[in-house]
Amino acid sequence: NMFTRGVEPAPTKPSNISARTQMGYGDVDAGFADADVIVERSYKTEQTHQGYIEPHACLASVNPDGTAELWVTTQGHFSFRNVCSSLLGLDIAKLKVTSSEIGGGFGGKTHVWGEPVALALSRKANRPVKLVMSREEVFRGSGPTSSTSIDIKMGAKKDGTITAAVAEMRYQGGAFPGTWAMLGCMTAFACYDIKNNRSIGWDVVVNRPKVAAYRAPSAPMAAF
């Protein structure tokens, strides 16, 4: 059972909401009271895939002496080394990871997918193993960005000064928690000089593919 983190008092019933994040400063109620005009809008963004030209691909080679090499289209070879060595019980000092030509990533190639499988097969076969996802496997097996539902409320003076702003953002995270909702909260009003603001982010778990990073995960929706 999952209980929402970041809520006070702590919930006593489980739900599909993993976490609540809040950021901001000032007095939004006073800011709205001082406004000449208040505008409220709701927006939705759809789940989209990074759509990189080259699919996920790797070449793994595990030697009898325990040393191993992994050539992989990755944006984060150190995290790949950490995850793969941990999953397979390899000595991290003996695993060398080389980032090959990425072929596009946009955040989607920071995550480990089939690489541990390639290493395990190489260790079993005592031969190098190459693994390349088909385009269908990329869409089925890797993660797109979150879809969102966002409510915005802003107050302003007649001279254009924004007196208060509130954003409530619900991020669809797929079947597992972890949507970087905090980055959305950090982004929502970062470009503006608003003395009274509050951003709330919800990490919502649903029966859909697990999401992955896509160009500053969770931030573009909030910036929009």
Question: What annotation goes with each model-predicted range?
Answer:
Residues 1-224:
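Structural alpha/beta core scaffold segments of enzyme domains
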